[in-house]
Each structure stands twice: as structure tokens, then as C-alpha cells.
Amino acid sequence: MTDKSFPASAITRVPLALLLSGLAGCADAIGFLEFSQLFMSFMSGNTTRFGAAVAQGEWDGATRVASVIAVFCLGAFAGTLVAAWAGRWRLPVLLWLQASLLCLGLGMPEGPVPFPFHVYPVVLALGMQNATLQDADGRSLALTYVTGAVVRFGTGLANLLLHKPADSFWIQAPLWGALSSGAVVGGVLHHYFGEAAFLFTAALAAGLALAVTVLTLAKPGSRLIAGTAPAPDAPADAAPVTVVRERATAPS
């Protein structure tokens, strides 16, 4: 079976996945504490809140949560298009966009209760984050939520007994740990800095963006920062949108 991982090399893909998952957990905890228990990346929780608000006739609250879910979906939509368009610059472009959006929220007006404008840039950034990396099957790695990681870990354990798990099984538990650790860090940062704690997540995204920009310039087409894969979650017969430089030696 064709390996559709992005980046192709686990040397960079796994650390990036863990750091980005930690970033998402951190941002989610900051937003949850700062914005009246509104999730920045955990759309399952927001969906439950939406249902409860509708059931109780709290239309401002229902609109508030629904708008956040829509913006997160827009982020995933835009991130996938950027991933397809940017080619070998996919990682730098997506990470710089995320860093910029995480900063932008701090300068946005609060907006009315149903439409929290200052939340949208953060949610948009985290939606885009899910288009950044792909597993061996071409699926976007679940970087901003744990339900998928927990389910894939559980089914992977079963498949470990039945036959063998998918290649992406081994990263699921570390992803959960990274997201949980990031949430702890986010809670501590919010305690001391309030909403300004988002600057920490922006700085982490910018640091990762700078690192992959340097790698892209120094090693164009390297498996460290590229891959031969369709856009995230594309059908099996979709054409590749990124190109890896072929090497006669061991993959870099």
C-alpha cells in the first residue's frame, strides 16, 4: 500500500504532531477558561452545548456555539485548500497562518454574545491545523481533539490481538498525552496571564513555522518537510499534490 504520510518522514512528522496537539490543548484550555466554557477546538463538546442551549431555548448561546462550530469547519476547509495549493510550502504556509490568527484574536473586538468575534481567529487557526499533517493512509491527523485518537487507540489494541494495528496506531496515545499536557499548561498560563496567554500558543506556532521554513529552504523536496500524497482525507484515487525528492539513500 502506498504510504500517504505528510511529511513522509516520521523524524519530523511525529514531533510536529505532538507539539501541535499540545498547542491545541493549550489554546482550548485558555479559551475554555476565558470565554465562559466555550471550546476552541473540541467541537464534540460544543455540539453538546449547542443541543442543550436549543433544548432550553437559550438562542443567544445556541447561536454563539453554532457560529464557532461553523468557523472551525471553515478552518478545516481553508486549510485543506491551502495544503493542496501550497505544495512543498504547505507546512510553512499553514503554520505561519496559524501563528498570525492566534495573535489576531487578541486585537479583535469582543462582538455581541451570539457572535464572539475575538474567538473566531483562534478557532479558525485550530480548524486549519487539522489539515497540516497526514497519517500513512492519507487521513488528517487528529491534532485538536482526543475522541478520534482514543477510538483509534482502542480499535488498534483490538487489531493488535486480531492481526496487526494500522501504522497510525502507535501515535494515538502520545497524541492524547500531548493534548492533555497542553491543556494543563494552558490552564496555568491563563491563571497568570488571562487572554494574553494565547501569545504563548502563537509563539509556539511561529517557532515551528520558522523551523519548517528553514528546512524547506535548506532541503527542498526532502521527506522531512514534504511527501507524495493527495490532500488530506482525499479519495484513494486522487492525484498527489505534493512531491518528495527521490533519494537513492535512506529517506531523510
Regions found by a protein language model. Give the residues of each.
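Helix-to-loop junctions at the C-terminal end of transmembrane segments
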Residues: G75-R88, H190-H191
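Symmetry-related core transmembrane helices of the 12-TM Major Facilitator Superfamily/SLC fold
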Residues: W96-L101, A196-V212
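Hydrophobic core of transmembrane alpha-helices in multi-pass small-molecule transporters
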Residues: L18-D28, Q37-F39, L101, V113-T144
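A membrane-interface helix-boundary motif in multi-pass transporters
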Residues: W89-L94, G187-A203
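C-terminal ends and interior cores of transmembrane alpha-helices
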Residues: A99-P114, T213-T216
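Substrate-agnostic recognition of the 12-TM MFS/MFS-like secondary transporter fold
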Residues: G51-A52, G57, A125-A183
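Short, Lys/Arg-rich, polar N-terminal cytosolic tail immediately upstream
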Residues: M1-R13, R223
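Hydrophobic/small/kink-forming positions within alpha-helical transmembrane segments
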Residues: I69, C73-F77, W176-V184
